[in-house]
Curated annotation (Swiss-Prot):
Assigned protein family: Belongs to the TFS-II family.
A Pfam entry, by short name: TFIIS_M
NCBIfam families: TFSII
Residue numbers spanned by region Disordered: 78-166
Entry superkingdom: Eukaryota
Record protein name field: Transcription elongation factor A protein 3
Modified residues (Phosphoserine): S115, S140
InterPro entries tied to this protein: TF_IIS-typ, TFIIS/CRSP70_N_sub, TFIIS/LEDGF_dom_sf, TFIIS_cen_dom, TFIIS_cen_dom_sf, TFIIS_N, TFSII, Znf_TFIIS
Amino acid sequence: MGQEEELLRIAKKLEKMVARKNTEGALDLLKKLHSCQMSIQLLQTTRIGVAVNGVRKHCSDKEVVSLAKVLIKNWKRLLDSPGPPKGEKGEEREKAKKKEKGLECSDWKPEAGLSPPRKKREDPKTRRDSVDSKSSASSSPKRPSVERSNSSKSKAESPKTPSSPLTPTFASSMCLLAPCYLTGDSVRDKCVEMLSAALKADDDYKDYGVNCDKMASEIEDHIYQELKSTDMKYRNRVRSRISNLKDPRNPGLRRNVLSGAISAGLIAKMTAEEMASDELRELRNAMTQEAIREHQMAKTGGTTTDLFQCSKCKKKNCTYNQVQTRSADEPMTTFVLCNECGNRWKFC
């Protein structure tokens, strides 16, 4: 068995341990990884860093967590070490690093090597662009502009790689998630980012002193552990949490979540009725009571008359009752039932 196949096998075992929340035997696997001669290509193709980072986040064994941190630190050093110090490629890499630093949040430092695969994918494109630009410079003066446009397109498309988080749609969250909150699934990472933006819908989240990214990650993890997939049911569940947390007419829900009065596990399972504001609950209750009162109107004991014409069947075979639904000085409400088609209506 080749080294790459062995790493893939270990990564799969670690992911299963995290999914089952049983990390027994993880220490032996991490020791095997520690003795392996790792390369950048193996880190990229096997994505072993993501699996080890998952164990680090979910394992309670201090020895396992410590060894996982050592592995991640060593691999990150390996990923950061190569790079051309001079020339055109060196300048382009420095520009890319400056752009990435501008996107980073001020309150976290990257721990796992999750972003370097994106850099390596950009390197072949950069090489091709530089070679093409050199060859085109000797052939005709018009070609360099075309190559520059192609290079700009490749740079614009680079954020779409699987290793980079999707751009959030909310203007209130402009920074990317910290690597420790990434799941390796682009759909889940996007949902965590949107939940975090919903928790930051108002500046008062700073008063609670909570890490919104961490809280959003916990909410998403509870939803995912319950549904076990990222299908439409999962997305609808996340979407309903976001809309209710961002509702300006229901600020109490978001504040209760930020303060801890509503836990991440509870908000992940609450129904739309449970998340609704007090005003909306009262309105729904009033509508329910009105509907019950209308449908509980007795069919027997009413007065049969031909004074009312049904709007559906146009017949005049009806039964009506008069009930005092409002205050005593208000007129009574007349409830009419068509004996032919069962149509009901009321008027005052």
